[in-house]
Curated annotation (Swiss-Prot):
Pathway(s) where this gene product acts: Bacterial outer membrane biogenesis; enterobacterial common antigen biosynthesis
EC top class, as a word: transferase
Role this protein plays: Catalyzes the synthesis of Und-PP-GlcNAc-ManNAcA (Lipid II), the second lipid-linked intermediate involved in enterobacterial common antigen (ECA) synthesis.
Gene Ontology BP, a term: enterobacterial common antigen biosynthetic process
Name this protein carries in UniProt: UDP-N-acetyl-D-mannosaminuronic acid transferase
Record key words, sorted: Glycosyltransferase, Transferase
Keyword check for Transferase: yes
Amino acid sequence: MEAKISVPKYELRGFSLWGFRDMAQCMDFLFDGGRVKRGTLVAMNAEKILTAEQDTELHALLDEAEYKYADGISMVRSIRRKYPGADVSRVAGADLWEALMQRAGREGTPVFLIGGKPSVLAETEQKLRSQWNVNLVGSQDGYFKPEQREPLFERIRASGAAIVTVAMGSPKQEILMRDCRKVHPQALYMGVGGTYDVFTGHVKRAPKVWQNLGLEWLYRLLSQPSRLGRQLRLLKFVSYYYRGKM
């Protein structure tokens, strides 16, 4: 089936981001043409951009990812400021993963899960099967040795997974996805950080009202004061924003 969905791209600090107007458009785009796309999905936010500017390996990994999207509200506001009239909305990574799993369950798309604690991963699998009848063809928790990487990649290839989601945190998940794609390129890869913990209720996400106001970062800071140092780093991004350096 021929692809029909057209989505604009926007440049921020040297990175090209897809600008989705809402989650529905994002999902239609990823499944456009009758099957899920192949490539790598990466959530972009201010912290990741700042880190990439100091980490050449991460920068290269992000450059290689085909589907970078505006996960943070800072990305959306920066796009709208640089490109007035841009019809773009935030696509939160946790919400995108759930939407992707729901669509995969409906269409029978084979899914492989990587990362998380063994108990959390088991809960995630159980909930995905019971809630959306997701066709899970394999899984691996995040506690494996370097010498187990190649056998894992072969397992993924043999499983025929069309979607592989990796919950290991950045940049570990991006590195693993890059390496796995060399063995099994016929899949959509998505780095999901701590999403399994949120999905299973082990980590509480900000209430919807905070999310809708673009204040999820503040909720996390108030819940975890140890994040203060990380948040202060974002002042550099704020300076980019107000000086028109996006």
